């Protein structure tokens, strides 16, 4: 309970002016009133001292009341012996004793501010309280003045050691090559009669030649960035294993069970090569990326599954097409390409031709991408490991207005917001015989997430509050008791919740969940009821389009109208890669290759962990990532870590500071994306059959005004017949225009399933299928491809 607003003024006025200290006090107050002009100061006498230390506060406590206008005042607690050391800080957070500010609202209501807290008091009872936070702004890289042209490419070819199964078994390197921008290129092929008698020997020779070449002109060639397509979970494994005993210093970055980049240093000659994963910047197959960017070089065709230790020097009849293309990927285009190949195969010659195309094609691709990013945005791709990271910096350098500041939130608030961060809903809304759909329409929304980015965003600092009024939360996140509507009111539910096993469902029963305000407000319109318990509000949230409209409009215009394939490709990637970066949770780790004795010593003293025993003498270790240096400095300036004392938050979130991020932006964009599709799930007379994040399957067509090329409009992907809808991401139908069976099957190879298999699943029968599985063991640095059988359980209704 709190005293009334005027309770302090009911105390006795302190008026003792019989000693020198009191005279000085009143002179100070008079001077202060004169300087400010709009304040009056009254001193009241309390009944206690403000410390048990009698040597410091040996007289009475005093309340210095600074009246500011007619409805606001600051109260500073001091005593008549030490006031002169503290009162000069009366209007500052540096004030050393209790201090608060009261704002008069009505006869019974006032707001008391104490530090970061505000208590809203009515008749002596706190209605709700708020805690105000002050987090640092998001930081971005600076643009580059000089284009870094030191770019190269690298590729390794492998075969499976299981000669009786096509392409299966443990993978072994048998060929490799690299190419640099200045024209230097070399290819290597396994030959048991030469020094290149193993995959490790090939890799050692490759990097030995590279470093020797760099040493010839160190000034021009040092610090090359060499790209490999799928470095993170493929090439890097063989490279680390092969170079561990060659005397190179190897370190890099690791995230999400994949290596982001490797830095290989020849310490003796002070030479450095950086390896980056091109698939992290260009997230498509090399074949698709080359064609999408209008590259002159196209990927060749090669019988990977025909290669084993006994066929490396094969010269003879061209193998069957199954060695070139997986059976489930056969099509007319691939068949035509296969038929155009020579009837006689010289495997070594064709491998080197194929390898040559791969490294030169990748080099052409990365040069095109590099040129576009530098010419358009003055950024060197060689500084970035991922597409989201470079897109984030494009936004920061080119489009970010710091008047709408994005805060890097950490600790309990970050975890609160992250708990409300859901992806798009994936649902099947039919059951029983309705799973067999005679006719229907499959629609996709144009640029759903960029469309969501055009809405109001949670910019500025957050405020945690126990306010239970729905209208209080303009833009934010709440923890609430949710009561869904009956099926008569709303057939297809859409407010998500996490079940005990971690899965996301839309429940018909009452539940508690963390919810963004767009979901909450839309839910109210469709019959949901909410009882808010607490939440996070962003009072300085920007208006619609103020944060991202320039970014979205810029790239959408390029995507829609540019004739430059490279720019068009980058625009499409940029539109869809930015939002998730704000909410990145995965911590980046540093990795280091060390001699075992040194590794043990470092692990015992630092936050490193064992990763792999690379050889008898060397160990690969990893350590938890550190914050960006700019962020570390910003957080160091904060006097203390913000915490929340509320029991709900303390018990669940207070244990860890978490990783600073702007997860509020990602969570809000994801919420807007969900609300953009939800209304179409319950169209009267045309209820949805199924939906995914940005797609919708209906029995009847959408109205014409909803269809178009504009952002946020719908486009018809398939008009179909004979649909079978088993469960989310497991369905099929026949496209009526191309007479092709369209199959979706998450977790298995969809093309291995027949129409009859889907019908069996709907009828409750289990279906057995198989798929090739890529297994990477980081402890042993071993890669294996295996064929496994998988059972898909039938629907039991």
UniProtKB/Swiss-Prot annotation:
Classification via Pfam families: DNA_pol_B_2
Superkingdom, natural source: Eukaryota
Main location: mitochondrion
Protein location: Mitochondrion
Keywords for this protein: DNA replication, DNA-binding, DNA-directed DNA polymerase, Mitochondrion, Nucleotidyltransferase, Plasmid, Transferase
Residues making up the signal peptide according to the UniProt record: none
GO MF annotation terms: DNA binding; DNA-directed DNA polymerase activity; nucleotide binding
Reaction equation(s) it catalyzes: DNA(n) + a 2'-deoxyribonucleoside 5'-triphosphate = DNA(n+1) + diphosphate
An annotated GO cellular component: mitochondrion
GO biological process: DNA replication
Cited InterPro entries: DNA-dir_DNA_pol_B (IPR006172), DNA-dir_DNA_pol_B_mt/vir (IPR004868), DNA/RNA_pol_sf (IPR043502), DNA_pol_palm_dom_sf (IPR023211), RNaseH-like_sf (IPR012337), RNaseH_sf (IPR036397)
This enzyme's EC code(s): 2.7.7.7
Remaining remarks: This DNA polymerase requires a protein as a primer.
UniProt cross-references to PANTHER family, sorted A to Z: DNA POLYMERASE, DNA-DIRECTED DNA POLYMERASE
Similarity comment text for this entry: Belongs to the DNA polymerase type-B family.
Protein name: Probable DNA polymerase
